[in-house]
């Protein structure tokens, strides 16, 4: 398998099990670090040209507005090509029940014919939401993994099991 890890992650003020906490590295990026350690796969971070606010409450309102508008936020960059990869591990936080709209910007930019997407979603209790069904509009999707963001630092064994169950490692 030749896979690329593509991810969207947000640092700054985040919600952790009922409380706000400032983090320098987002939960999804921490999970991606575990995947990279376990697989050695390359990764690509999706970053918006105009990022969401560092303030959590403002961020969720901005994300909600993007969802309502079906926006496709401009990204600083996209991978040059996905041709060398047969699989994409797509990691993201659950924003309003689906992927962040910046992830849709990525999905819209490529043809996923012949590729398989493995979704990994960080959240604080909302699970995968409808993200898997939304991604299926673009690509063949295998079993996704929902991780509670506040526990992701210790989730390497769970991630390893998911990778093994999907025959990624």
Feature annotation, model-predicted:
Residues 125-138:
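Glycine-rich, charge-decorated loop segments at or immediately adjacent to ligand/cofactor-binding or catalytic sites
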Residues 1-87, 97-98, 104, 157-169:
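N-terminal beta1-alpha1-beta2 submodule of the flavodoxin-like/Rossmannoid cofactor-binding fold
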Residues 129, 151-156:
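Short, charged, surface-exposed secondary-structure boundary motifs
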Residues 85-86, 114, 139:
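Short, well-ordered alpha-helix to beta-strand connector turns
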Residues 82, 108-114:
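Short, conserved loop/helix-junction motifs that constitute active-site signature segments
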Residues 92-93:
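Glycine-rich, N-terminal phosphate-binding loop of Rossmann-like dinucleotide-binding domains
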Residues 42-44, 139-148:
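Short beta-strand elements in bilobed, periplasmic/extracellular small-molecule ligand-binding domains
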């Amino acid at each position: 398998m030749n896979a690329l890890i593509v991810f969207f992650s947000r640092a700054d003020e985040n919600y952790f099990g009922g409380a706000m906490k400032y983090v320098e590295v987002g939960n999804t990026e921490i999970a991606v670090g575990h995947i990279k350690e376990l697989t050695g796969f390359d990764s690509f971070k999706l970053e918006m040209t105009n990022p969401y606010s560092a303030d959590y409450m403002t961020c969720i309102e901005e994300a909600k507005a993007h969802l309502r508008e079906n926006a496709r936020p401009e990204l600083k960059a996209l991978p040059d090509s996905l041709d060398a990869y047969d699989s994409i591990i797509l990691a993201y936080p659950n924003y309003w029940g689906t992927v962040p709209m910046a992830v849709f910007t990525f999905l819209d930019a490529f043809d996923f014919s012949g590729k398989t997407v493995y979704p990994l979603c960080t959240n604080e209790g909302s699970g995968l939401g409808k993200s898997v069904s939304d991604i299926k509009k673009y690509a063949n999707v295998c079993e996704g993994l929902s991780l509670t963001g506040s526990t992701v630092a210790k989730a390497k064994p769970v991630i390893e099991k998911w990778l093994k169950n999907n025959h990624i490692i």
